[in-house]
From Swiss-Prot:
GO terms for cellular component: cytosol; kinetochore; microtubule cytoskeleton; midbody; nuclear membrane; nucleoplasm; nucleus; spindle midzone. It is found in: Chromosome, Centromere, Kinetochore; Nucleus; Cytoplasm, Cytoskeleton, Spindle. This is Centromere protein V. Residues 148-260 form the CENP-V/GFA domain. The keyword Cell division applies.
Amino acid sequence: MRRSRSSAAAKLRGQKRSGASGASAAPAASAAAALAPSATRTRRSASQAGSKSQAVEKPPSEKPRLRRSSPRAQEEGPGEPPPPELALLPPPPPPPPTPATPTSSASNLDLGEQRERWETFQKRQKLTSEGAAKLLLDTFEYQGLVKHTGGCHCGAVRFEVWASADLHIFDCNCSICKKKQNRHFIVPASRFKLLKGAEHITTYTFNTHKAQHTFCKRCGVQSFYTPRSNPGGFGIAPHCLDEGTVRSMVTEEFNGSDWEKAMKEHKTIKNMSKE
């Protein structure tokens, strides 16, 4: 009996102890559950504070990134209206019309029944439509004159000149003309045209430097020059002309060694370079 009572008492004491420990564990669990949200909030606030501190402690060397605009937006600009003073200005005038280019073919000309004659004339003269028209107009303007062509020996210098088919030649005996055998006829500057070779021409002057003695750099031939007696014209060497346009030549001696006296005595030489 005593043993059964003591064992029952021991069971009761064990139950009481387990109940006490369970009761004490329950409040602890509830307390832990109650503390969990606060701990979470504490960790969140700590992380937010850390991020803020990192933002504050960001080194100043790092510049904020600029927002790039697209190329189209850059071209279009901010879209602001033009200033009022520019808005009041009239629009620029339209560009002038393109001038008509010279015709190079007879098909662009209204020649009517003269077309065949015109084309035959072009072929014989070996000219373009513009060149043929120029030749006919020059012939009309320089009535009684013919077009002579000529140049130096090597062909680097070429020219054309309108003059009579019957040439009046001067044979000067001044120091330089005697040395270079300068026989020439005189024409106004407007009737002379250098076709090519300006870069191949060199000029020699002396004394008064009014006479411009021009020579070809390549072959040394003087085919024309500017005489002292006629600074507004040209002296053309007849022996440098192409064959076929000279009908006759008359030669007159000019006493260039006594130039002032010869100029006073000659009544027409100055007028030979005038129109």
